A protein has these predicted regions:
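Short cysteine-rich clusters marking metal-coordination/redox-active sites
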Residues: 10-13, 28-31, 74-77, 92-95
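Intrinsically disordered, low-complexity segments
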Residues: 1-5, 37-69, 103-130
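Hydrophobic or amphipathic alpha-helical targeting/insertion segments
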Residues: 23-37, 91-92, 99
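Cys/His-rich metal-chelating microdomains
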Residues: 14-16, 34, 79-80, 98
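Short, non-ligating residues that shape and space the ligands of small metal-coordination modules
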Residues: 19-20, 37-38, 83-84, 101-102
Length: 288
């Protein structure tokens, strides 16, 4: 399987083109040439193809769902980031650790969709400056980075999404809270104390739910508390994957494998199904 080439030279001057988030096209910063992305969703309607889970697990290295890319592994934070073929040394975009790029190929499942960048670098910088201004305490390194006006680099974060059509049978119990009055003596005085009791009755049934695009971040470069904060993407804006969207940006390769991601997604589904079961049982309290 050949190494994927995600470079897009300008037809006019030969410089590298980059994806322009503002107008969703490829532009050349050297000569100003503009090229329309061919077969993009705005010129040809295409549905996003999804993969069967079991089939993806069994995919062989030369299967069409696989691709070969050149990936660098950060020894500090563990990020795996794709780099241009002519780049031999750089720094990790997550932790700034110096990295020597790996010239060996990396096989992985090819992306099926992409959520294109929507902000230009100028807009992203303004948003970062506004965010820093609202903080009581900001890391000195981050403030210094912003003051120096260093260029921001956009990076695509990999994610898995899972669909599942579930039907679950359950056996449990429905609890109805009632109260009993008990006479007690406290400090020599007679008092009435109300005690909550629960009357349990058997309950059983069946619930069904279709899960659409349960999203699991496939990167471990960021701490988990930050990963959960970036998982709320607007997936209605997904486009069928084209490498042109990555031109001028970096793309992180996934470090959370498909099976591990499915276990996390199943945990999300299990918790929702449990809520559905408790709602179906009804009452004041539930046992499942």
């Amino acid at each position: 399987m050949a190494l994927e080439d995600h470079r897009f030279p300008c037809d006019n001057c030969g410089s590298d083109l980059r994806f322009d988030p503002g107008d969703e096209r490829l532009v050349c910063d050297h000569c100003g040439n503009v090229e329309i992305i061919e077969h993009g969703p705005w010129t040809q309607s295409r549905a996003i193809a999804e993969l069967d889970f079991e089939a993806a697990l069994k995919a062989l290295p030369d299967d069409p769902v696989m691709e070969v890319t050149r990936v660098s592994h950060c020894p500090n934070c563990g990020a795996r980031v794709e780099f241009d073929p002519d780049l031999h040394a750089t720094e990790c975009p997550f932790c700034a650790t110096p990295v020597v790029t790996d010239t060996g190929p990396s096989r992985q499942i090819k992306p099926r969709a992409v959520l294109p960048f929507a902000l230009e670098e100028k807009e992203a910088r303004e948003a970062m400056t506004e965010w820093l201004g609202a903080l009581w305490f900001a890391p000195n390194g981050l403030q210094e980075y912003a003051r120096k006006g260093r260029r921001l680099s956009g990076i695509y974060t990999p994610c898995w999404t899972f669909d599942a059509d579930t039907k679950s049978s359950y056996n449990g119990a429905r609890g109805i809270v009632y109260y009993e009055d008990h006479k007690v003596v406290r400090n020599g005085r007679h008092e009435i104390r109300r005690v909550a009791k629960v009357r349990w009755t058997p309950a059983s049934g069946r619930v069904a739910r279709f899960f659409d695009d349960v999203l699991i971040v496939a990167s471990e470069a960021l701490p988990k508390r930050f990963r959960s904060g970036i998982a709320n993407w607007d997936l209605t804006r997904l486009e069928p994957y084209l490498p042109e969207y990555l031109a001028g940006f970096r793309a992180e390769a996934y470090t959370v494998e498909l099976e591990q991601a499915f276990r996390e997604a199943r945990g999300v589904m299990d918790r929702q199904i449990l809520r559905d079961v408790k709602f179906d049982i009804g009452g004041d309290r539930q046992r499942v």
